[in-house]
Amino acid sequence: MAAPREPRYITVDEWRELERANPDAKYEYFDGHVYLMSGGSLAHARIGSNVVRTLEDTLGDASCYTYNSDASIRVSETRYTYPDASVSCDPRDEPTTEQVQIQAPRVVVEVLSDSTEGIDRIRKANFYHACPTIQEYMLIATKCQAVEVQRRAGDEWTLHLFGPGDEIELVSIGVRFSLATLYRGTAVPEPPNDQD
């Protein structure tokens, strides 16, 4: 019987080379492990587009930059992710043809799916909470209209929950918008009413 194969760890430089060799694929990198990002549902794609558009519209001419899921962020020296959306207000992250990763994200957004929800809620939440530039982490549900924002408050993180009819505020970038704008054009239902 053959011995089980040991997991192969790769360096950040090897991961970058893998990304250059496969420009149509996105690979997240966590501490020597590489994870291929898969596509999501149409609702996931639409919500991702809506959140980027909403952030762009509400930020207006502010000196912040909104990015979609094609932009990776450097969470630490050994962790790089592709969130569904992110915002940076750091001049180092001004969009240029040379810049390949966001260095100082302030807001990170993940649209939840069945296959990634556990990773987004636990592993990535821990990574994002450890990144000193990230002030807010927004998770958007696809099973029902529900959003949570995890907000840095000194050394702690506070949880803010939003549902239909609510206005979401992202304090770190000074914007407010209706939860409904995130679900525009989708068939994602409202959460069940617990009062019935």
Describe every region a protein language model picked out.
Residues 1-196:
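Gly/Pro/Ser/Thr-rich low-complexity, intrinsically disordered segments predominantly at protein N-termini
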